[in-house]
Amino acid sequence: MGSFPCPQKIEQVLLSGQGLNELSFASRPACASMLVERVPHHGVVYGLGQETAVAQPNLPEGFDFTDPDVYAERIPYQEFAELRKTAPIWWNPQPPEIGGFHDDGYWVVSKLEDVKEVSRRSDVFSTHENTAIVRFADDIPRENIEMQRFILINKDAPEHTKLRKLVSRGFTPRAINSLREELTERAEKIVKEAAESGAGDFVTQVACELPLQAIAELLGVPQEDRLKVFDWSNQMTGYDDPELDIDPQAASMEILGYAYQMADERKKCPADDIVTTLIEADIDGNELSPEEFGFFVILLAVAGNETTRNAITHGMMAFLDHPDQWELYKKERPKTTADEIVRWATPVNSFQRTALEDTELGGVQIKKGQRVVMLYGSANFDEDAFENPEKFDIMRENNPHVGFGGTGAHFCLGANLARLEIDLIFNAIADHLPDISKLGDPRRLRSGWLNGIKEFQVDYKTASGGCPVRH
């Protein structure tokens, strides 16, 4: 492989990193009768010249399941429930000037089995065509969307198969287990340092730290550079939030440049990290191109950080809203906890596919070129798939959630790493901060697809008696 080029060669870089989370990661469901302003029952849905007779759900007029203003306030669990009950696969109209795709809307898929079917049928439902991201900035140039096809999650077979085979070498059970001791020590240190402050923002002091350290360890990022990488990743996912003073495109260029620099250094001095593994990878005569490597580092740095930290934050919020489960966790530490946290949190609300041909899904005709949005946040509360889905239950054994992106070729590459991080950080919190409590409501990220929390103020209340059980 030749030397890696300067990142300035990629002039139209992905706008704000909006194509992330193959590594992958509020309010709860409530009665649908709380809805006001209803859409009339038309009985006919139009899309790309298609007429399909389907049931019409009772939704607020003009409701858009990718509207970042909705998610800045809440997760629309009531609307999800209405879809599952009335129209599990429903055409959501959207003006062409909204979201960057210049079409007239998209299908929303709300039930677990239908979401899994879309995920499995990668020969029919493409991530490459319009990427997996459900909503971009309204004025994004088409070439910026197409640039995101370098990212693993936005590739179809056979390119996706080749790349996934290459990069999965860095996520073997052996590779993940090799991080356990280091991450255990990090988790303890993070929690103890937070405790010393007495009170503060759980997101920045606790939830952000362990995912950052885990990804940095995998990449071999020096300690002095880790906060810089963290800041870049934040900028690349906060593009839809006006409260954040960021430059997503500049951050994209910075992290690409950093990736190329790392690769050049490892070529000269190989190390025991994923960077060396990837730049030396050669399977069936193929290797990562410079662009593929750079965008994989973006995926790893951003998705591996953002989704897991939001899962941890939502997990802490769930425990504090359900104190019986926190007491149970402190005593039992069930291994089922991490997956229930991921189900409950659903760090990525939705991803999309695009139909490559006319097809059928759940009795609904989908036309070639139409987008299909998988509502993970709805599927994970499907009454037909989960017993008492509205209950946060860390002992839940039957838990076929899609918090790691469903099934099939794009199942979360870093799922086991995320589970490990969640397990380690909550063990440390239970040991050292068993009486933690919230001081205010969380501040949500404005995003059409990420279930992000920007701030969550807590009182750490350091325990005097220590953990109630021994480990």
Swiss-Prot record:
Residues the record lists as binding heme: 412
Catalytic activity: cholest-4-en-3-one + 6 reduced [2Fe-2S]-[ferredoxin] + 3 O2 + 5 H(+) = (25S)-3-oxocholest-4-en-26-oate + 6 oxidized [2Fe-2S]-[ferredoxin] + 4 H2O
Induction: By cholesterol.
Class in the EC hierarchy, top level: oxidoreductase
The keyword DNA damage appears for this protein: no
Protein task: Involved in the utilization of cholesterol as the sole carbon and energy source by degrading the side chain. Primarily catalyzes the sequential oxidation of the terminal methyl of cholest-4-en-3-one into (25S)-26-hydroxycholest-4-en-3-one (alcohol), (25S)-26-oxocholest-4-en-3-one (aldehyde), to finally yield the carboxylic acid (25S)-3-oxocholest-4-en-26-oate. Also able to sequentially oxidize cholesterol itself, not only cholest-4-en-3-one.
Top-level taxon of the source organism: Bacteria
Entry annotated with the keyword Heme: yes
CDD domains: CYP142-like (cd11033)
GO molecular function, one term: cholest-4-en-3-one 26-monooxygenase activity
Gene coding for it: cyp125
Traits of the deletion mutant: Cells lacking this gene fail to grow in the presence of cholesterol.
Record keywords: Cholesterol metabolism, Heme, Iron, Lipid degradation, Lipid metabolism, Metal-binding, Monooxygenase, NAD, Oxidoreductase, Steroid metabolism, Sterol metabolism
EC number: 1.14.15.29
Residues reported to bind substrate: 238
Gene Ontology biological process terms, A to Z: cholesterol catabolic process
SUPFAM superfamilies reported for this sequence: Cytochrome P450 (SSF48264)
Protein name as annotated: Steroid C26-monooxygenase
Family note: Belongs to the cytochrome P450 family.
Cofactor(s) annotated in UniProt: heme
